[in-house]
UniProtKB/Swiss-Prot annotation:
Similarity comment text for this entry: Belongs to the reaction center PufL/M/PsbA/D family.
Subcellular location as annotated: Plastid, Chloroplast thylakoid membrane
Name of the gene encoding the protein in the UniProt record: psbD
Membrane topology classification: Multi-pass membrane protein
One matching Pfam family: Photo_RC
Binding site for pheophytin a: 130, 143
Positions of chlorophyll a ChlzD2 binding: 118
Protein name: Photosystem II D2 protein
InterPro entries registered for this protein in UniProt: D1/D2, Photo_II_D1/D2_sf, Photo_RC_L/M, Photo_RC_L/M_CS, PSII_PsbD/D2
Length: 353
């Protein structure tokens, strides 16, 4: 006979179990292991952005005023990118550029790299939070998969594109008017609106908006008249077993309108997920192409004919001339460190301008 000394209990918890309970079970607001990445990164990204837009100038990097302290408002304030001369330096506070001097670090554009990287990891942390919580309550991870699309766009625009160019300088600054300037830059230097990946992105976003509006209206139109609540939001029990709206009625309605309709809710909702996520992913892939200076569609035959025949012009050739104008007028003021001076005779002129 074997005699065991001591007792074994399944209730004994390791330090990892205690930490897991503290992060995931013992609180009203879920933190989770993903929160160890999400919350610090989100805090630092937002804190850096508010600090930069409130106090920090862009005079030393772009020759611009960019803070509330200098007279900007919410639409014109920004955390601007570092100077072009700093290339792809991480601009660490303790690095060789700032050498631990916080004021100098801000003047050099250190807040931009700080916000960009903490923002990227904060978004990744939020996606992991959705994965973790879905696994905890035994849901499928489609929310997290969908959120990968805006992450792909953020990473491609703010990190991969400038990595393919000469420095962080050519990334968007974090501000409303600054993003508008970046969009004009993308159009003038990359003809972005004629890029097929941009077209797919626009189709995805606008198509998703259309699907969302149609779906919401259809559900409202086909609600069962049930319950004694004062309004739609109180008329149904959230734990009810029966349907809230009539899928059959909705199917018959759209079959009459379009001739075709979704036959079941699974395909309908998957399509509503697929359209915007695919559109954003395609747009992100297109921006990666721009990082490598890949070109959009070029209709050279139209350009040659327009150059030879002053009476021939298409919307494409007009846009090409406008892009030349953006490049010529924007480069000099957008990159003052290059000391670009364009003589009058090389500035674009033509039927479009």
């Amino acid at each position: 006979m074997t005699i065991a000394l001591g007792k074994f209990s399944k209730d004994e918890k390791t330090l990892l179990d205690v930490l897991d309970d503290w992060l995931r079970r013992d609180r009203f607001v879920f933190i989770g292991w993903s929160g160890l990445l999400l919350f610090p990164c989100a805090y630092f990204a937002l804190g850096g952005w508010f600090t930069g837009t409130t106090f920090v100038t862009s005079w030393y990097t772009h020759g611009l005023a960019s803070s509330y302290l200098e007279g900007c408002n919410f639409l014109t304030a920004a955390v601007s990118t570092p100077a072009n001369s700093l290339a792809h330096s991480l601009l660490l506070l303790w690095g060789p550029e700032a050498q631990g001097d916080f004021t100098r670090w801000c003047q050099l554009g250190g807040l931009w790299t700080f916000v960009a990287f903490h923002g990227a990891f904060g978004l990744i942390g939020f996606m992991l939070r959705q994965f973790e919580l879905a696994r905890s309550v035994q849901l499928r991870p489609y929310n997290a998969i969908a959120f990968s699309a805006p992450i792909a766009v953020f990473v491609s625009v703010f990190l991969i594109y400038p990595l393919g160019q000469s420095g962080w300088f050519f990334a968007p600054s974090f501000g409303v008017a600054a993003i508008f300037r970046f969009i004009l830059f993308f159009q003038g230097f990359h003809n972005w609106t004629l890029n097929p990946f941009h077209m797919m992105g626009v189709a995805g976003v606008l198509g998703a908006a259309l699907l969302c509006a149609i779906h919401g209206a259809t559900v409202e139109n086909t609600l069962f008249e049930d319950g004694d609540g004062a309004n739609t939001f109180r008329a149904f029990n959230p734990t009810q077993a029966e349907e809230t709206y009539s899928m059959v009625t909705a199917n018959r309605f759209w079959s009459q309108i379009f001739g075709v309709a979704f036959s079941n809710k699974r395909w309908l909702h998957f399509f509503m997920l697929f359209v915007p996520v695919t559109g954003l992913w395609m747009s992100a892939i297109g921006v990666v192409g721009l990082a490598l200076n890949l070109r959009a569609y070029d209709f050279v035959s139209q350009e040659i004919r327009a150059a030879e025949d002053p009476e021939f012009e298409t919307f494409y050739t007009k846009n090409i001339l406008l892009n030349e104008g953006i490049r010529a007028w924007m480069a000099a003021q957008d990159q003052p460190h290059e000391n670009l001076i364009f003589p009058e005779e090389v500035l674009p002129r033509g039927n479009a301008l």
